[in-house]
């Protein structure tokens, strides 16, 4: 009987602990700035100068260096803007990033190549959302920034087209 009471107490304690850990932080619906730190694999979202929340991310399969050409599997570096929102993406939902800019296009053209495009902040591939944070085990995108489906839901809802995004090394 004593063991049963201890087991029940442990289960209740774990349930309470889990409920505190799993509560979602509510973020205001006004993300004005996104900062991506590629080397740390984190993305910070801001309202003006106030940090709202930090997310762990996965990047392109070859994350070192600035994206220069279509198919190089790199994630861009520099200052861009959110230029689109797609709730029907192949990756749950996505926010478009304004890569390539004029400078990116000119560099690629000078080399006789395409700069590429379609760089996004997105969730997991449709039907794979249950893997959650396991996607962080390695960089797997074609140059995009990936978060969990739950995370893209809150980022998507709080970000307007035109928000600034700065991608650092």
Region annotations inferred by a language model:
Residues 33, 54-56, 79, 118, ...:
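Well-ordered beta-strand positions in beta-sheet-rich domains
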Residues 22-32, 59-83, 102-107, 149-150:
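N-terminal post-signal-peptidase region of extra-cytosolic proteins
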Residues 2-3, 12-26:
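Bacterial Sec-dependent signal peptides at the C-terminal "C-region" and cleavage site
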Residues 25-63:
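A structural motif detector for short, solvent-exposed N-terminal "entry" segments of globular domains
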Residues 44-46, 53-54, 64-67, 90-92, ...:
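Short, solvent-exposed loop/turn elements at domain surfaces
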Residues 31, 52, 77, 90-92, ...:
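Sequence-level motif detector for i,i+2 pairs with an aromatic at +2
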Residues 84-169:
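Exported/periplasmic cell-wall-interacting domains
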């Amino acid at each position: 009987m004593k063991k049963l009471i201890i087991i029940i107490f442990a289960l209740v304690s774990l349930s309470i602990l889990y409920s505190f850990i799993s509560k979602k932080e509510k973020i205001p619906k006004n993300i004005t700035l996104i900062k991506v730190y590629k080397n740390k694999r984190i993305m910070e979202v801001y309202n003006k100068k106030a940090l709202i929340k930090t997310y762990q991310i996965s990047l392109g399969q070859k994350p070192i260096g600035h994206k220069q050409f279509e198919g190089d599997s790199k994630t861009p570096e520099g200052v861009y803007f959110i230029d689109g929102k797609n709730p029907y993406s192949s990756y749950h939902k996505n926010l478009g990033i304004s890569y390539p800019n004029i400078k990116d296009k000119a560099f690629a053209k000078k080399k006789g190549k395409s700069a590429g495009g379609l760089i996004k902040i997105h969730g997991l591939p449709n039907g794979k959302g249950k893997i959650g944070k396991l996607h962080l085990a390695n960089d797997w995108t074609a140059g995009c920034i990936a978060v969990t489906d739950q995370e893209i839901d809150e980022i998507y809802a709080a970000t307007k087209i035109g928000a600034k995004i700065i991608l650092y090394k």
